[in-house]
Amino acid sequence: MLRTKITGSSHVLRTAFKRYSSTIDSGAVEVVKPKKTSFTRRLFRLGLAVTAFYAGGVAVSQYDDDLGTLFTEKVPGAEKLVDSYVTYRYDPTISKMLSTEYLLNLFKGENTEVKPSTSSRLVPIHDAIKELHLELLELDSENNSEPEMQKIINSLNSTINMINEQKLRIGGKKSRSIEENYKQLIEDILHLDKNLKETVSKSINEKTEEVVKKVREQYKRKLAVSEVELQDKYKNEFIHLKEEMEKHYQDILNQKLEANKQHLEAKHANEIALLSITQVSEFNKIIKEKVDSERNGRLAKIEDLDKKAENLTEALKHVNKVVTRNEAVKQIAQQIEIIRSKLNSHDLNSISLHDDLTRLRTLTDIAVPGPKPCCKHKDLTPSLFRVALDELESVAGSSESKILSEEQIYNRWNLLESDFKTASLLPPNAGMLGHFTAKLFSLFLFTKRGSALPDATDLDSVFARINENLRHSKLDKAVADVVTLKGWTHVLCDDWLKNARRKLEVEKLVDVLDSELKSL
């Protein structure tokens, strides 16, 4: 309520001083008769509408501050018009000039001189107009005021600063009246601050006593309850601790008893073992004495017999090793012949050497042993036989890698006959049309058969010579002729050349194995 009252007072002060803030301004009014034309009539109506709008805005601004603020901010020249209206309204001379009586006399042509009022003539100048200055309200720093009271005082001081910044000049009586009311307002605020602090202090003391009393009662109740709870808690903990300690020490006792039992059993077992060892040593001593006595008699030649038996065993081992190695060499020779017969066969199916090479590896480990794992000498190298066997396993040792037979190589070469005819008719750098034309005319060519001249380089002669070499199982010469081919013909024979080289490599490795086997 106090804050509302102070805010209302500040609003009244602000409104009152705003109305007295302008100076008196005089002027003459010149009446001009408009010409009776349509343009002047429209101009007159427009001026009348603008005048009515501004007059209505000024009238509304005197009764509603929000609309007045909106009018002065949004309409051009509205702020000056409102200030002039306030000045003329509260000035006695101007008010009399704008009175109804003055206007009637003006229209009748009578003397309309405005005489200043007697009161205005009797009042001195320094009493009639005085600059208003209000002192700010300050509370004593030693008194701790409430935050709400401090906010009210700050709001009032901001309003007073706004009034002082306007430097309002008003009559002396009104100034003194305003100052007296302001002093009374300050006294009321200070008295209200004092009463508010006393009321707050008294309320705080009463609330504090009530809270302390309640806290003490709650503390006594909680203390009694906590005492009972603590007694029960410690009693239960003591019983639980007692049971745990009994269990713990009972377990320790059982463990110690078990350990002592095991210790006694181990000690007893050790004593029995020691006794048995002693008895065995005594028995061994007796046996040794008996053997020594017998050795010096009937068993005097037993050591010589033992050495001869060891020599015989070593001789038998060596003979067995030689026989085993010779048998393994024979088996290796047979296995090499089996592989060679498969390679030279005219079977239509591919040749798989996985099982044969596995058996050959087993026989090689027996007949041609490699370096011992314990030997770390750097100069030791595997034999040529084992190197060739390793290379042969890398080429054809897997179960999926198969070697083409002689018949398959020959048949696949014959499949390239039509492509060779086409290639023999191709011009250099032939395009699609050249390939098509060569393919067409190759249908009219005959294939050359039989032996061809060794020096002939035309494709027909080369094809016939390779065909003849394959027919006589001369794969190495056929491969040599294919290698000499160039260009498109070499591309056509690429897959066939890979398979033929692979078969030829296997044959050469088999020949190496056969040669090395003869030197073993």
From Swiss-Prot:
InterPro entries: MIC60 (IPR019133)
Keywords: Coiled coil, Membrane, Mitochondrion, Mitochondrion inner membrane, Transit peptide, Transmembrane, Transmembrane helix
GO biological process: cristae formation; protein import into mitochondrial intermembrane space
Reported function: Component of the MICOS complex, a large protein complex of the mitochondrial inner membrane that plays crucial roles in the maintenance of crista junctions, inner membrane architecture, and formation of contact sites to the outer membrane. Plays a role in keeping cristae membranes connected to the inner boundary membrane. Also promotes protein import via the mitochondrial intermembrane space assembly (MIA) pathway.
GO cellular component, one term: mitochondrial crista junction
Designated name of the protein: MICOS complex subunit MIC60
Segments on the Mitochondrial intermembrane face: 61-520
Native organism: Candida glabrata (strain ATCC 2001 / BCRC 20586 / JCM 3761 / NBRC 0622 / NRRL Y-65 / CBS 138)
Pfam families: Mitofilin (PF09731)
Keyword match Cell division: no
Residue ranges the record marks as coiled coil: 176-325
Membrane topology: Single-pass membrane protein
Residue spans crossing the bilayer: 43-60
Presequence range in chain numbering: 1-20
Ranges of the Mitochondrial matrix topological domain: 21-42
Complex and partners: Component of the mitochondrial contact site and cristae organizing system (MICOS) complex.
Lineage of producing organism: Eukaryota, Fungi, Dikarya, Ascomycota, Saccharomycotina
Major subcellular location class: mitochondrion
Family: Belongs to the MICOS complex subunit Mic60 family.
Subcellular location(s) per record: Mitochondrion inner membrane
